[in-house]
Design a protein with these regions (language model features):
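N-terminal Rossmann-like NAD(P)+-binding domain of SDR-like oxidoreductases, especially those catalyzing
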Residues: 1-204
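Conserved hydrophobic/aromatic "anchor" residues
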Residues: 11, 207, 329-331
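C-terminal substrate-binding subdomain of Rossmann-fold SDR/epimerase-dehydratase oxidoreductases
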Residues: 17-18, 229-360
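Short aromatic-enriched loop/helix-cap "lid" or pocket-rim segments at secondary-structure transitions
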Residues: 42-44, 67, 130-134, 211-215, ...
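Activation loop
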Residues: 43, 82, 219-223, 321
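Residue-level signal for the nucleotide or nucleotide-sugar donor/cofactor binding architecture
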Residues: 60, 91, 99-102, 167-170, ...
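Solvent-exposed, non-membrane alpha-helical residues enriched in polar/charged side chains
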Residues: 66, 108, 188, 224-225, ...
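NAD(P)-dependent short-chain dehydrogenase/reductase
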Residues: 132-161, 185-262, 291-298
Length: 360
């Protein structure tokens, strides 16, 4: 089997390459990356040691994609992954669309040409921001939590277990979310029209050692590294208390599901049979305040500034209910948050220069 991994030099791409090399005997791995993410250059030697043929190319250029050798499967792990992309001054809206949607379109033409299957890594940020902001949560014991007295089934697509795949995707979802949602739709349409398998994985917050974490993407690794180095940290919005909650997932658990998907065929043409949440779930959900408490215990106290001013697209509670993937593949995350935090902390302690790698 030959697998093409896009964004191969990123944290997720490299993690997938490592896991698939171990899981699939004789697999031929090809990677493509434009190496634009700060820190991605450091993974080139890792990929070389894994026997990955890394192509320095850009998915925005159709000619770069057309020049790639034929593969049996494509795992699309390339994206501008920030929910603030297009509005934060780092990239324009057009650049965001070209990266995320244009790149996926070129890959879909590649899959059509070579009859390759596609696994598209998407995001929890495809969901309606007003609907997410209206979820029945309140601050309890240092974190936003689902209100226990909320009637069952009173919220369409969500429960105390998290957000389900049928939650509203009505705009606004952010420019970033719109590019990923459009990519999902195109992928499903291409797969149906041209007869190749498509799986879509809407991922929660991926976290682990070696991640190039930033405040807007990779928050757990970012927070732990900055806490250890006594760099400034801020609780932004929601009163500046740090109560906002996300669930975390180790990339090895994502890789396990991807491996299962590589040897499976979608059961039916309905989108519901091909779109899955891949997240740590309610058991791995932690607030920033809880993460700080963990860091204080590990590294010693470090003051965090309070900034109550709201930031665009910030939400109090995003937890993914991944029971659809569990039902389909008997898949569950095997690494809990404390294990993930410990792994990140050990890596941070061994690599005092990591923040500089991550921030460029």
């Amino acid at each position: 089997m030959r697998i093409l991994i896009t964004g191969a030099a990123g944290f997720v791409g490299t993690s997938l390459a490592h896991a698939l090399r171990s899981a699939i005997a004789g697999v031929d791995l090809i990677g493509i990356d434009n190496l634009s993410r700060a820190g991605s250059e450091t993974n080139r030697s890792t990929l070389r040691a894994l026997g990955v043929r890394l192509v320095h190319g850009d998915l925005r250029l159709a000619s770069d994609v057309e020049a790639l050798p034929a593969a049996d499967w494509v795992i699309d792990a390339a994206a501008n992954p920030s929910v603030l992309a297009g509005i934060d001054g780092r990239s324009s809206p057009r650049q965001l669309v070209e990266h995320n949607l244009g790149g996926t379109l070129h890959l879909l033409d590649y899959c059509r040409q070579h009859r390759a299957g596609l696994i598209l890594l998407s995001t929890s940020r495809v969901y309606s921001i007003p609907a997410l902001a209206a979820l029945p949560v309140s601050a309890q014991d240092g974190a936003f939590r689902w209100n226990a007295n909320t009637p069952a089934a009173s919220v369409v697509g969500a429960s105390e277990q998290g957000i389900r795949e049928d939650f509203s995707t009505e705009a606004p979802v952010s420019l970033y979310g719109a590019t990923k949602l459009a990519s999902e739709t195109l992928a499903l349409e291409y797969g149906d029209a041209f007869g190749f398998p498509v799986w879509i994985n809407r991922c929660g917050v991926l976290a682990g050692a070696g991640q190039f974490g930033r405040a807007d993407q990779g928050i757990f690794a970012y927070w732990i590294n900055r806490h250890l180095r006594r760099r400034p940290l801020r609780y932004i919005g929601f009163g500046g208390h740090g109560f906002q909650v996300r669930d975390c997932l180790h990339p090895a658990d994502l890789a396990h599901l991807v491996h299962l998907q590589l040897t499976s065929t979608p059961d039916a043409p309905s989108p519901g049979s091909r779109i899955f949440h891949v997240g740590g779930g309610i058991g791995s959900a932690r607030s920033l305040l809880q993460l700080t408490a963990w860091c204080d215990d590990r590294f010693g106290p470090h003051a965090v500034a309070e900034d109550p001013a709201p930031r665009p697209y910030d939400l109090p509670w995003i937890v993914l209910d991944a029971r659809r993937a569990e039902s389909r593949w008997q898949w569950r995350p095997t690494r809990g948050p404390e294990q993930i935090f410990h792994e990140i902390a050990e890596h941070a302690e061994r690599n005092p220069e990591w923040l500089e790698h991550s921030e460029g």
